[in-house]
Amino acid sequence: MLHRNGSFIFATCVVLTGVIRHASMSTAVAEDVNPNYASFAKAVLDGRNVRLTLDLARCTAHGGEARGPQVRGSIRFDAYMIQGDQTIAFATTHFTVRTDNTAVDEFLSFRVHPNGKVDVRTAFLSPITFSVTQESEFDCDIGQGATFHW
């Protein structure tokens, strides 16, 4: 379910910007840029310290042609999982307060496919019931909105 409400997109951008800024301020610049799925998968299996730089304006809203919001930054993840279909999945979550002063848990998940497609999903969850209250999805490509560094 993709909400196209302007205030939701703004709130998503604010929260993503906070996560991305926090992650990027706590790390040094990585040595290598990942040019494709195969080198990313190898880095994951080799236990490399991988960082994702994200530019949602170079991605599209899931299932459509509209560009994503003007949000850029970097994120580190603690764990990666290569699934049976070779999709690489990873996620992070954090507690935050939206611009309307509503407390939420935000869940960010990523799936990288062998063809280089990257699915980005953000979901706001109620901290009381853990039910999803809002979510958005974006379609990116390795090197086009989503770049991996190690």
Question: Each predicted region: which residue ranges?
Answer:
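General secretory precursor processing signal
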Residues: L16, H62, G143-Q144
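Bacterial N-terminal signal peptides that target proteins for export
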Residues: M1-T12
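C-terminal segment of classical bacterial N-terminal signal peptides
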Residues: L16-S26
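Secreted/processed peptides and extracellular or luminal domains of membrane proteins
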Residues: V19, E65-G68, A146
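N-terminal secretory signal peptides
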Residues: A28-R98, F130
